[in-house]
């Protein structure tokens, strides 16, 4: 069996759909929302790598590496903010985020 680009696109679309569903179905837990955003970014990366391999061009793979770097920084900053928020409030529920003073 030959794995074609359509297989990669189907898997990527499923990952993207699961990520969107994770955001919309679970609005109470911030960690699951962050994980869903990471899943969406990974599905976009899979698209870049699939098209890069299909077109024999390395630009998509380089762009995917940049996206992974930004996603790792975003996850680290998001988790650091959650740790500080949990220390101050004792909860990481989304309902408690909108009562922040700034």
From Swiss-Prot:
InterPro entries, per database record: NADH_UbQ_OxRdtase_chain4L/K, NUOK/Mnh_C1-like
Compartments, as annotated in UniProt: Cell inner membrane
Broad class of where this protein is predominantly found: membrane
Keyword set, alphabetical order: Cell inner membrane, Cell membrane, Membrane, NAD, Quinone, Translocase, Transmembrane, Transmembrane helix, Transport, Ubiquinone
Transmembrane stretches, start-end: 5-25, 31-51, 66-86
Topology versus the membrane: Multi-pass membrane protein
Keyword Transmembrane: yes
GO annotation, cellular component aspect: NADH dehydrogenase complex; plasma membrane
Reactions listed under catalytic activity: a quinone + NADH + 5 H(+)(in) = a quinol + NAD(+) + 4 H(+)(out)
Domain of life: Bacteria
Molecular-function GO terms, alphabetical: NADH:ubiquinone reductase (non-electrogenic) activity; quinone binding
HAMAP family for this protein: NDH1_NuoK (MF_01456)
Similarity remark: Belongs to the complex I subunit 4L family.
PANTHER family linked: NADH DEHYDROGENASE SUBUNIT 4L-RELATED, NADH-UBIQUINONE OXIDOREDUCTASE SUBUNIT ND4L
Quaternary state and interactors: NDH-1 is composed of 14 different subunits. Subunits NuoA, H, J, K, L, M, N constitute the membrane sector of the complex.
Role, per record: NDH-1 shuttles electrons from NADH, via FMN and iron-sulfur (Fe-S) centers, to quinones in the respiratory chain. The immediate electron acceptor for the enzyme in this species is believed to be ubiquinone. Couples the redox reaction to proton translocation (for every two electrons transferred, four hydrogen ions are translocated across the cytoplasmic membrane), and thus conserves the redox energy in a proton gradient.
Protein name per UniProt: NADH-quinone oxidoreductase subunit K
Source organism per UniProt: Bartonella henselae (strain ATCC 49882 / DSM 28221 / CCUG 30454 / Houston 1)
Gene that specifies this protein: nuoK
């Amino acid at each position: 069996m030959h794995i074609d680009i359509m297989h990669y696109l189907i898997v990527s679309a499923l990952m993207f759909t699961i990520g969107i569903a994770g955001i919309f179905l679970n609005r109470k837990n911030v960690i699951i929302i962050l994980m869903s955003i990471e899943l969406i970014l990974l599905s976009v990366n899979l698209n870049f790598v699939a098209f890069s391999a299909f077109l024999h061009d390395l630009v998509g793979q380089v762009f995917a590496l940049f996206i992974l770097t930004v996603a790792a920084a975003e996850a680290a900053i998001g988790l650091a903010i959650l740790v500080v928020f949990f220390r101050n409030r004792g909860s990481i529920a989304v309902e408690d985020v909108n009562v922040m003073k700034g």
